[in-house]
């Protein structure tokens, strides 16, 4: 039997209202959020793109709930191939770097920062859609302030 979270992601569309509904549902329960993140990070799963669509909205509102998954995110980011999942993934990377730059934000380890830098630079070099490149450039700009 499919879980409620799975069914909501499966029924979601690319429309903002649909993605907001799924992200709000995930933020209400840590188990739902965990399931959404597991689906998003499983790049071979059919719903991984849809899960990323809503995950970027979760990270925009409540990034600290995503903090325990940063290590896995740094591993999965370079492996994402689908353009539809890449835009929200690079947007999440931007949120992480922006938060890392703040005093009371999420602290990234130096290794995590370097993994993000490497993955984001690869995205700029590769033939990707513009939206993911924009978020990659924004994130690299924020990280560049630290590494001059």
What positions do the PLM features span?
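Alpha-helical scaffold domains
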Residues: 1-148
């Amino acid at each position: 039997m499919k879980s409620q979270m799975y069914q909501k992601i499966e029924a979601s569309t690319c429309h903002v209202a649909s993605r907001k509904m799924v992200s709000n549902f995930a933020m209400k329960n840590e188990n739902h959020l965990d399931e959404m993140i597991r689906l998003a990070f499983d790049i071979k799963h059919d719903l991984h793109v849809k899960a990323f669509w809503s995950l970027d909205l979760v990270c925009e509102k409540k990034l600290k709930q995503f903090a325990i998954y940063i290590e896995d995110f740094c591993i999965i980011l370079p492996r994402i191939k689908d353009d539809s999942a890449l835009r929200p993934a690079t947007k999440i990377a931007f949120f992480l770097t922006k938060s890392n730059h703040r005093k009371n934000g999420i602290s990234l380890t130096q290794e995590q920062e370097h993994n993000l830098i490497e993955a984001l630079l690869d995205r700029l070099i590769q033939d990707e859609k513009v939206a993911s490149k924009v978020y990659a450039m924004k994130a690299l700009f924020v990280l560049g302030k630290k590494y001059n």
